[in-house]
Amino acid sequence: MWPSDAHLALSLVVNVEEGAEMSLRDGDKGPEPVDELGVHLKIPIRNFANESNYLYGIRAGWPRVEAVLAKHGVPATFTAAALALERAPDIAKALSGGLHEPCSHGWRWVHQFSFDEARERDFVRKAVDSIRATTGQRPLGWLSRYLHSPRLRRTLAEEGFLYHMDDFSDDVPRWDVVETDAGPRAIVLVPYALDTNDMKFWLAPGYTPEQWLDYAIETFDVLHEEGAAAPRMMSLGVHLRIIGRPGRIRAFDRFIQHARSKRGVWFATRLQIARAFAAATPAPAEPAAT
């Protein structure tokens, strides 16, 4: 299924959310609740401390992450909230070169699952238009902030998305068929992973860099071994404000070093993975439209 009969497709996912998180400055009812210290303010005031923590991801975290990717010459999928790229043009420019892929993480990094259908569709379209304008690439994949509505996948198919990554159900992609106004359409589910995500540094009991690296390498080694019998994929998700800290960035570097030392590994964007899967696996027979 993978090029050159690779055992494992390795997907590095860089989340770009900083500058698009919840904030009173952008009209939200309260400040961003996701905080390294787990501080959840109950009153509607600006949390300048956490805002600066997110800004760290842009100012200091991004250069470190960019340097590690450039050192190894490997591609990554950047799941980006569109507004974050508008406010960080250097990152948007880095996604215009063709090596990396921009994937839509929404117009802003907010919960859209409660939106009505019209607002949700506008949210999707606004994200697409913005990312295309800042990077020169039209995003063909989507990742929500945690939850999504039952109709989102249908909306994505109707809006021309190739794949959806709000799924954690397997170690390989699969097809889904959704009913649209134009009839049934197939969309690729490219599963993501939370267990290898660097959010583990922020969630109690927080991982040390060594614990996170050990877990990521163990995951890689098992999937790489299994891939000799049947192709596998692995996702490693990181955030600029988290892995970009000086005490953590070497764990990211060392993981990539380990993966590059093994044969039969295909470093790929999620779009490349979705396309390879779709080329090798015919879409399921679509039921007749009713």
Regions found by a protein language model. Give the residues of each.
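A conserved mid-domain beta-alpha-beta active-site/ligand-binding segment of alpha/beta enzyme cores
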Residues: 189-222
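Catalytic alpha-helical scaffold of carbohydrate-active enzymes acting on polysaccharides/glycoconjugates
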Residues: 1-188, 213-236, 242-290
